[in-house]
């Protein structure tokens, strides 16, 4: 990821993040002073991408802990209660992305592991854990790049969907990590970027990131993918994930399932890149994944202007589920996992309680 920007960070007791709704035309920093501000940023997609919102939520827990420690005056039970409230608030904002609840659970459990702490001790431990989650995510993304680069053929043409780059993570990205690694190694590579309606994460964010890195790209509308596959222009598809369940089913941005079907029809490898924090083996298959439904206005409006007739109600599931049998391999920081996925995912995923 270019050193010119960070996705989310802690500064002077606040959570800072780039407002991704405004890119690429404006780079605005949002400063969150309370956990409610972080929840709002996640819900309104000022910050998005499963790993990134996990990092932001961890820092949101730190804001809640610091505020409660200031008010608690020795009452540790009060700070734990405030952390539980903060976790419930944050978890409710984007239910499909499991990194969110994983991060808040990890922070809360770490705080509860302290022996006879003061409120200050709890707040300090929560902030340290949030810093650790951010650093670990960045390291995992680099590892995904190292493992995944071997899957891209020489002079490879890669199709990606939505944004699974540095803006979706602590930095460097998941689906874009192998692409970045190939580019850093001096290997010629070209990326086909789905614009990704209705929020245009591909056109606005992925294209912007690739331009920062001077990686060649072609922007296409979502309904052009089959055309370029049939022409032989695509060597492989690499996407990110918001949740990978026990059998290998993958929840990701709406439209991912369609790409997987097209890739199978054209015998093109379909890879999913995600850190282990995205693996959720508590769910047996994709039918159990909660799918977030977002506002109809995000489909019928574009940049504040209506693009559909007044009164039209649009469906807007934010994610779909790609069955495991359409996935060629899953790239994690631990290595490349091939079917059958179940056993390897159990070993690779984080422990959840």
From Swiss-Prot:
Active site (catalytic residues): 242 (proton donor)
GO MF annotation terms: S-methyl-5-thioribose-1-phosphate isomerase activity
Annotated site residue numbers, Transition state stabilizer: 162
Pathway where it operates: Amino-acid biosynthesis; L-methionine biosynthesis via salvage pathway; L-methionine from S-methyl-5-thio-alpha-D-ribose 1-phosphate: step 1/6
A GO BP annotation: L-methionine salvage from methylthioadenosine
Binding positions for substrate per the UniProt entry: 48-50, 94, 201, 252-253
Keywords recorded for this protein, A-Z: Amino-acid biosynthesis, Isomerase, Methionine biosynthesis
Ranges that cross the membrane: none
Protein's UniProt keywords contain Cytoplasm: no
InterPro entries associated with the record: IF-2B-related, IF-M1Pi, IF_2B-like_C, Initiation_fac_2B_a/b/d, M1Pi_N, NagB/RpiA_transferase-like
Catalytic reaction list: 5-(methylsulfanyl)-alpha-D-ribose 1-phosphate = 5-(methylsulfanyl)-D-ribulose 1-phosphate
Enzyme Commission number(s): 5.3.1.23
Enzyme class: isomerase
PANTHER family for the chain: METHYLTHIORIBOSE-1-PHOSPHATE ISOMERASE
Family assignment from sequence similarity: Belongs to the eIF-2B alpha/beta/delta subunits family. MtnA subfamily.
Known role: Catalyzes the interconversion of methylthioribose-1-phosphate (MTR-1-P) into methylthioribulose-1-phosphate (MTRu-1-P).
Name recorded for this polypeptide: Methylthioribose-1-phosphate isomerase
């Amino acid at each position: 990821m270019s050193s010119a920007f960070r996705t989310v960070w802690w500064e002077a007791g606040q959570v800072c993040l780039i407002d991704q709704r405004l890119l690429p035309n404006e780079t605005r920093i949002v400063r969150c002073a309370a956990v409610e501000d972080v929840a709002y940023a996640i819900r309104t997609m000022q910050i998005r991408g499963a790993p990134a919102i996990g990092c932001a939520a961890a820092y949101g827990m730190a804001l809640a802990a610091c505020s409660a420690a200031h008010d608690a005056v020795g009452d540790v039970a009060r700070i734990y209660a405030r952390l539980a409230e903060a976790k419930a608030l944050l978890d409710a904002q984007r239910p499909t992305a499991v990194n969110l609840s994983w991060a808040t659970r990890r922070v809360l459990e770490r705080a509860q592991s302290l022996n006879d702490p003061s409120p200050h001790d709890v707040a300090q431990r929560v902030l340290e854990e949030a810093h650790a989650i951010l650093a670990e995510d960045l390291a995992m993304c680099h590892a995904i790049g190292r493992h995944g680069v071997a899957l891209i053929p020489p002079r490879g043409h890669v199709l990606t969907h939505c944004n699974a780059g540095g803006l979706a993570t602590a930095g460097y990205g998941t689906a874009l990590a192998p692409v970045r690694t190939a580019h850093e190694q001096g290997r010629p590579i070209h990326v086909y970027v789905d614009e990704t309606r209705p929020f245009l994460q591909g056109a606005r964010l992925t294209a912007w990131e690739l331009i920062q890195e001077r990686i060649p790209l072609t922007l296409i509308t979502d309904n052009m993918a089959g055309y370029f596959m049939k022409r032989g222009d695509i060597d492989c598809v690499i996407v990110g994930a918001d949740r990978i369940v026990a059998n290998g089913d993958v929840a990701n941005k709406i439209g991912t399932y369609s790409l997987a079907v097209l890739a199978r029809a054209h015998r093109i490898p379909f890879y999913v890149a995600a850190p282990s924090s995205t693996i959720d083996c508590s769910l047996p298959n994709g039918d159990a994944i909660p799918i977030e439904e977002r506002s109809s206005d995000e489909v019928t409006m574009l940049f504040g202007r209506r693009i559909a007739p007044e009164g039209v109600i649009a469906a807007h599931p934010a994610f779909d589920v790609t069955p495991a049998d359409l996935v060629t391999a899953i790239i994690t920081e631990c290595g490349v996992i091939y079917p059958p996925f179940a056993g390897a995912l159990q070993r690779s995923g984080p422990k959840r309680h």
